[in-house]
Every structure is written in C-alpha cells, then in structure tokens.
Amino acid sequence: MQGFKQHTGLVVPLDAANVDTDAIIPKQFLQKVSRLGFGKHLFHDWRFLDDAGEQPNPEFVMNHARYQGASILLARENFGCGSSREHAPWALADYGIRAMIAPSFADIFYSNSINNQMVPVRLTEQEVDELFQYVQATEGAQIEVDLEALKVRANDKEYSFGIDDFRRHCLLNGLDHIGLTLQHEDKIAAFEADIPAFLR
C-alpha cells in the first residue's frame, strides 16, 4: 500500500455534524466485499435526486464545480458515526479522499479510515471553523496535511494535530494488517522451521 507522508489537495467543505455511515454509503450498496467501485455511491442520497444516481443534486456541495477533484474532506464533529461498516472509508478512498479534517470522528470509523490509508485529522472546533471560513471564501483553496510533522497548513497558518505512534507508523509506511505481519516474515519462517515434521 502507498504510504502517506504529506499531501496537499483541494478541499471540499461538508458543513454538517454527526454525518453517519449510512449517509456516507447507503445500505443498498453494501452487497460486495471488494474495496473498489464504491466512490460513485459516496453520499448517494445527498448527491443525487434519483435512486439510479443519474440526476446530480445541484445544491449538494460535492457537486459544485469548484470542489471537483477534492482530495481532502473538511467536516464537523462526530463524522462517521453510526454502524461500523468498513464500506464507508472504502467509498471515501475510492472517490479520491486522502485525508479528512474534523473536530472528532466516531471511534470505529477513525480506525477503519487509518486501515484504508486515509488520515483522519482532529483539530479543535475553532480551528475547523477557521478552515471552513477559508475554504468557503476561497475558490481553489488547498490544505496541506503533513503526517511527518503532524501539521496542517492552510492560508499561511499552521495547526498541530496528534495521532498515536503505531498508527502513524502504519500510515507513513503504507502498512495494513498483512503488511505488518510480513514485517516479521523472518521470525515466522524461523518458527515454522522449528515445528516438528509430524505437525506440519
């Protein structure tokens, strides 16, 4: 998996609190276990006026021309609440989101996002307010998320954020659960070599 060190991208401001996983990816699209293809269904009930997803809702922020190609999502508190479906971060990642910034995230969604190589950045409500004001007032506004320095940079300002060392290590090095296991491949091989033949 691709590691995440720094990323600068266009920002889409989703000015809503308590956005749940059913809004992020509605239940009717949870019929497969591949991570790919969910981006087109992201926020389906908000992005589209019809069930088939053929009539974009012109009022929904992600359909505005100025936010097309956004790779950073700016949101309000408790983003990703609701059921623990991993399809929610799959949909965001498949859409092209690399990082999310909010005052808080639901715990399971936070972990699932990191497992899918997206960086969920927690800032204070005041700092998030400042970023909303900047992004909404500035067409083409970009934000830099620097995981190495644990900084967010925007509009000539710098904000600090935290993440535990283990999760940061995984994100920086592009490690999922399989990748973490393979880091100990030599120890696994040595253990297997010591197993008696009749147990193999």
UniProtKB/Swiss-Prot annotation:
Q: What is its EC number?
A: 4.2.1.33
Q: Does the keyword Amino-acid biosynthesis apply?
A: yes
One term of GO molecular function: 3-isopropylmalate dehydratase activity
Q: Which UniProt keywords apply?
A: Amino-acid biosynthesis, Branched-chain amino acid biosynthesis, Leucine biosynthesis, Lyase
- Keyword Lyase in the entry? The reply is yes
Q: Which residues form a coiled coil?
A: none
Q: Name one Pfam family in it.
A: Aconitase_C
Identify the domain of life. Answer: Bacteria
What InterPro entries would the database entry show? Answer: 3-IsopropMal_deHydase_ssu, Aconitase/3IPM_dehydase_swvl, AconitaseA/IPMdHydase_ssu_swvl, IPMI_Swivel, LeuD
GO CC annotation: 3-isopropylmalate dehydratase complex
Query: Which residues span the membrane?
Result: none
Q: Which GO terms describe its biological process?
A: L-leucine biosynthetic process
Q: What's the catalysed reaction?
A: (2R,3S)-3-isopropylmalate = (2S)-2-isopropylmalate
Its pathway is: Amino-acid biosynthesis; L-leucine biosynthesis; L-leucine from 3-methyl-2-oxobutanoate: step 2/4
What residue stretch is flagged as signal peptide? none
Listed under subunit, the entry gives: Heterodimer of LeuC and LeuD.
Similarity-based family: Belongs to the LeuD family. LeuD type 1 subfamily.
Task: Tell me, in a sentence or two, what this protein's role is.
Answer: Catalyzes the isomerization between 2-isopropylmalate and 3-isopropylmalate, via the formation of 2-isopropylmaleate.
Q: What is the official name of this protein in its record?
A: 3-isopropylmalate dehydratase small subunit
What is the native source organism of this protein?
Answer: Vibrio vulnificus (strain CMCP6)
